[in-house]
């Protein structure tokens, strides 16, 4: 695999041998994000931020369909308030710090730093007839499986719903970018899937130990 730069962060909350850790350590919570809520919750969230609730549908279209958080591209929002609205409703949750590529670029692992310095991983896998995303539900893991490096490292904290969703959105953005580059290089229309078709919770963490956030992301 080829790789870019990395800044590792140690995860130190590790269960005793033979024990599992189901309750995540107490840590600060990430900022609230549009993706933490269902549509009704997003409308309430926007209202609390001082904006009309109907803006939630517009922001949802930009984020989930257009995969953008760039306020300059959101021309259906008021120019005077769109930057402040986007910054408050869709704060940056993930910062990519490392990538690993295999299979000629068809498999890409991304390592992201969260707001508190914790690290999580996701993997984008492209096949002829599908695109699969492997995502994390926790930073670290408390299951303490002896065969798993993540489990042996310990559990830092649960991810929020939006932090889980953001991994998929980031993967979808990367897929879209890769397809554009391939089309420009070869001058042909894409022949492989254009969207993420499968999502598996097989990254870091045990999704059932972070049930509420995992279900919210689904």
How should these model regions be labeled?
Residues 1-131:
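Flexible, acidic/Gly-rich N-terminal and inter-domain linker regions that tether
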Residues 120, 125-136, 142-218:
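Conserved Radical SAM active-site core
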């Amino acid at each position: 695999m080829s790789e870019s730069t990395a800044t590792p962060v140690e995860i130190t909350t590790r269960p005793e041998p033979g024990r599992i850790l189901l309750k995540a350590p107490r840590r600060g919570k990430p900022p609230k994000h549009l993706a933490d809520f269902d549509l009704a919750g997003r409308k309430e969230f926007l209202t609390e931020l001082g904006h009309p609730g109907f803006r939630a549908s517009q922001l949802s279209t930009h984020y989930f369909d257009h995969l953008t958080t760039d306020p300059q591209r959101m021309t259906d929002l008021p120019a005077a308030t769109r930057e402040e609205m986007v910054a408050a409703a869709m704060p940056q949750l993930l910062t990519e710090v490392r990538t690993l590529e295999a299979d000629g670029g068809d498999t890409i692992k991304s390592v992201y730093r969260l707001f508190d310095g914790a690290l999580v991983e996701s993997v984008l896998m492209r096949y002829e007839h599908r695109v699969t995303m492997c995502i994390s539900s926790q930073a670290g893991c408390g299951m303490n499986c002896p065969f798993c490096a993540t489990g042996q490292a310990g559990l830092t904290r649960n991810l929020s719903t939006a932090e889980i969703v953001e991994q998929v959105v980031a993967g979808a953005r990367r897929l879209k970018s890769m397809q554009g580059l391939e089309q420009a290089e070869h001058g042909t229309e894409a022949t492989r899937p254009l969207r993420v078709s499968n999502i598996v919770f097989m990254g870091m963490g045990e999704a059932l130990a972070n049930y509420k956030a995992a279900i919210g992301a689904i």
